[in-house]
């Protein structure tokens, strides 16, 4: 048995560890802390410890388990919440309370729970590695397939059915003169990639339902994508804006000052912005559908803005907001979101009014949704403090302003997990702040799978490894997550793995490397950073699996990077971009303009576009690629023309260039912009995306023809068909085709009036 001779944070040096091998798991000290051998010199072993080493002393024992760091694989993984080394956090909470006691190592899978095993083979059949022996209904959404472990083949001499625990023997296989007992549970070393028969080219897209991703920057099943980390959630209202709480009205600026002084709250500070995560949520009111309901806010945002818009209404209501902040405007029978700078006199905006009803004994006061007409709008320039409340679970709005106006708030989350057509989602919170992980752990279990109505957790595994946990466990969490993903891929499922954030993992590598006194590379990161990042992303892919039957599965890896100050030239971002083929560039400026998803179409890219072209042409339309290229061309041209417009002014520009700016605005606002909280707009099928894009390009074509015939953009900008196009995003899937046909007919008719009778007839 070895003994400790040196301790440096999470790094421990021991000597005379019995039978020491690289990456063996050891138990360190009297408390039996879990560690892993990462370096051997003579009789000295260097160990990275996955738990806090405070209080450990030299000469304490080190015991070698003689096995590598492994995960348990079997029924019960789904719906679980693990830490970085697959310890179930719900079990630990029962044992040690809110904090993880050191030395605890409960089993990852419940040993007592019984699962209904349904055999898929019979006694006497010959089986091979990867073959499915039987199935277990793990959750309402996922059937768990029990496979023959690697290295085992032969005749089935016993196969069980009925209810069994994960450690029970459910089959016996005889081959090569040996008899093998097979349990429902198996283990696998996390650093070793699971074998596949062959990798396949990325030819099928991971459909997310998000138009900016599916249409412009698609990711393939089995592909890799990089996303920069979180940023400011956007600016909203001035500090003197009243917010309606359950205890009455309070100025949002006062609420922020009280919150930032409360030591129980967590404060995050960025450049010209602060977010206070509230220990005690604010009880407020929000608009959900056509009702005003009680809601809660878990955070307050403070930032700066160089302009404020004051909006006043007929009945004396008033609010001061940033120009890009959206108000809810009534158009016909529907309510749409419109930036305050674009709200006009005469528009009716959503408000709340107090309704009292009852008899002389009891009076019940309720809030009801109403609309008030705008009578004036003023723009003020200068530097203003602005604030926002985060209300993620109640339509992202709150009631405030002088006179109870519905105020918008939007932060998009969980869309890929909720809407992508992956069967399994593995989310790794690697080194994120505890409050952020808490928000995910509390909101994820409440989300519903939109296709089945079942809880999203029924197909999800969460791995939580917060920033105050030992840094060594961050690296382990990445490997734990990808190994679990590979296991479900081997069953034939499509898995989406989200690692948030790989930058925190790289920081852990840097700290361990520093403790080992290794030669630092760029910015202090170890020289092998690029290799480690590549090893992780290389475990993604779509593959023909090891099995006698033809079975396919995929792992799509989406890694978030959190570069300091948003500088993607730093080593972690550059090494990530080198091995990933999709980059979704999140843009704080777009978020501030309330454009969500805030993926910048000029800075983002996808290298899968050509690989997926034939799939889109075959399964959606042969015009798909041409429409996409034209949309990208218009958006690129818009960025060039905006500089010209700023120099010479919009009115001095040629009509054709005005048209490009106009169509680009339609693409941005009516196609790329998408509401995560609108029941219809949250998910957009590929067919609907195609018809929306085609309708926009139809306007582009006919607008150019009308301009050639002498029309001006002033004539065309007020056509009624343009408003009908902007409403297409909220048309239900079942009605979208007939809506599109009517829309195109109206485009031909209204623009035909400007083209001239001859041209109109020719084009029709």
Swiss-Prot record:
KW Membrane (keyword) present: yes
Post-translational modification: This protein undergoes a protein self splicing that involves a post-translational excision of the VDE intervening region (intein) followed by peptide ligation.
SMART domains in UniProt: HintC, HintN
Location(s) in or outside the cell: Cell membrane
Residue ranges that the Swiss-Prot or TrEMBL entry lists as coiled coil: none
Alphabetical UniProt keywords: ATP synthesis, ATP-binding, Autocatalytic cleavage, Cell membrane, Hydrogen ion transport, Ion transport, Membrane, Nucleotide-binding, Protein splicing, Translocase, Transport
Sample GO molecular function, one term: proton-transporting ATPase activity, rotational mechanism
Pfam families: ATP-synt_ab, ATP-synt_ab_N, ATP-synt_ab_Xtn, ATP-synt_VA_C, Intein_splicing
One of the protein's GO biological processes: proton motive force-driven plasma membrane ATP synthesis
UniProt membrane topology term: Peripheral membrane protein
Known catalytic reactions: ATP + H2O + 4 H(+)(in) = ADP + phosphate + 5 H(+)(out)
Stated family: Belongs to the ATPase alpha/beta chains family.
Function, as annotated: Component of the A-type ATP synthase that produces ATP from ADP in the presence of a proton gradient across the membrane. The A chain is the catalytic subunit.
Quaternary structure and interacting proteins, as annotated: Has multiple subunits with at least A(3), B(3), C, D, E, F, H, I and proteolipid K(x).
Protein name: A-type ATP synthase subunit A
Species, as recorded: Thermoplasma acidophilum (strain ATCC 25905 / DSM 1728 / JCM 9062 / NBRC 15155 / AMRC-C165)
């Amino acid at each position: 048995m070895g003994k400790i001779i040196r301790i440096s944070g999470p790094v421990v040096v021991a000597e005379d560890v019995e039978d020491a091998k690289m990456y063996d798991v050891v138990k360190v000290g009297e408390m039996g802390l879990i560690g892993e051998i990462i370096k051997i010199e003579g009789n000295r072993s260097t160990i990275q410890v996955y738990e806090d080493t405070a209080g450990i002393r030299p000469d304490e024992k080190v015991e070698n388990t003689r096995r590598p760091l492994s995960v348990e694989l079997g029924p019960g993984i789904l719906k679980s919440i693990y830490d970085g080394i697959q310890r179930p956090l719900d079990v630990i909470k029962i044992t040690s309370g809110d904090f993880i006691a050191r030395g605890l190592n409960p089993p990852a899978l419940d040993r007592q729970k019984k699962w209904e095993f349904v055999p898929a083979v019979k006694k006497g059949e010959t089986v091979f590695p990867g073959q499915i022996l039987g199935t277990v209904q793990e959750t309402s959404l996922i059937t768990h397939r029990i496979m023959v472990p690697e290295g085992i083949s032969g005749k089935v001499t016993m196969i069980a059915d009925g209810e069994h625990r994960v450690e029970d023997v459910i089959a016996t296989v005889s081959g090569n003169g040996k008899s093998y007992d097979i349990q429902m549970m198996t283990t696998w070393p996390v650093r070793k990639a699971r074998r596949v028969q062959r990798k396949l080219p990325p030819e099928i897209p991971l459909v997310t339902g998000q138009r900016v991703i599916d249409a412009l920057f698609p990711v393939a099943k089995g592909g890799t994508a990089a996303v920069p980390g979180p940023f400011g959630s956007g600016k909203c209202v001035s500090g003197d804006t009243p917010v309606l709480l359950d205890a009455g009205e309070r100025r949002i600026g006062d609420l922020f000052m009280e919150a930032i002084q409360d030591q129980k709250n967590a404060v995050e500070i960025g450049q010209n912005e602060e977010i206070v995560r509230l220990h005690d949520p604010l009880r407020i009111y929000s608009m959900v559908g056509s009702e005003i309901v009680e809601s809660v806010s878990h955070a307050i945002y403070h930032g700066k803005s160089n302009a404020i818009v004051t909006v006043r209404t007929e009945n004396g209501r008033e609010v001061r907001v940033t120009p890009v902040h959206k108000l809810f405007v009534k158009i016909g029978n529907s309510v749409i979101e419109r930036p305050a700078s674009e709200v006009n006199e005469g528009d009716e905006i959503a408000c709340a009014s107090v309704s009292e009803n009852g008899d002389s004994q009891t009076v019940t006061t309720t809030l009801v949704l109403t609309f008030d007409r705008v009578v004036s709008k003023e723009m003020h320039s200068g530097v203003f403090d602005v604030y926002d409340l985060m209300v993620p679970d109640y339509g992202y709005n709150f009631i405030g302003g002088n006179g109870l106006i519905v105020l918008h708030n939007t932060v998009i989350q969980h869309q890929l997990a909720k809407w992508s057509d992956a069967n399994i989602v593995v989310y790794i919170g690697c080194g994120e702040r505890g409050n952020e992980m808490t928000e995910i752990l509390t909101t994820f279990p409440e989300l519903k799978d939109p296709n089945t109505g079942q809880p999203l957790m029924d197909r999800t595994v969460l791995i939580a490894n917060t920033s105050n946990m030992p840094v060594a466990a961050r690296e382990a969490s990445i490997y734990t997550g990808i190994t679990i993903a590979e296991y479900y891929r081997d069953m034939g499922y499509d898995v989406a793995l989200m690692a948030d954030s790989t930058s925190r993992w790289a920081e852990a590598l840097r700290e361990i490397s520093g403790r080992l006194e290794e030669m630092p590379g760029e910015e202090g990161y170890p020289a092998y950073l690029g290799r480690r990042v590549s090893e992780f992303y290389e475990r993604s892919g779509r593959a023909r699996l090891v099995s006698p039957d033809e079975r396919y599965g995929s792992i799509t890896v989406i890694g978030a990077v959190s570069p300091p100050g948003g500088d993607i030239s730093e080593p972690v971002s550059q090494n990530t971009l080198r091995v990933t083929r999709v980059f979704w560039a999140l843009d704080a400026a777009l978020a501030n303009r309330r454009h969500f998803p805030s993926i910048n179409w000029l800075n983002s890219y996808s290298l899968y576009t050509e690989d997926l072209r034939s799939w889109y042409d075959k399964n959606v339309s042969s015009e798909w690629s041409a429409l996409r290229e034209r949309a990208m061309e218009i958006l690129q041209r818009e960025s060039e023309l905006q500089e010209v417009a700023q120099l010479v002014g919009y009115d001095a520009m040629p009509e054709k260039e005005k048209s490009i700016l106009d169509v680009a605005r339609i693409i941005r606002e009516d196609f790329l912009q998408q509401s995560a909280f609108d029941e219809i707009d949250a998910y957009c099928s590929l067919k609907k995306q195609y018809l929306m894009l085609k309708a926009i390009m139809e306007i582009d074509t006919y607008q150019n023809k009308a301009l050639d015939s002498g029309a001006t953009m002033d004539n065309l900008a007020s056509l009624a068909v343009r408003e009908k196009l902007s409403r297409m995003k909220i048309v239900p899937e079942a009605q979208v085709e007939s809506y599109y046909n009517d829309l195109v007919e109206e485009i031909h008719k209204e623009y035909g009036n400007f083209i001239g009778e001859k041209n109109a007839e020719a084009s029709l």
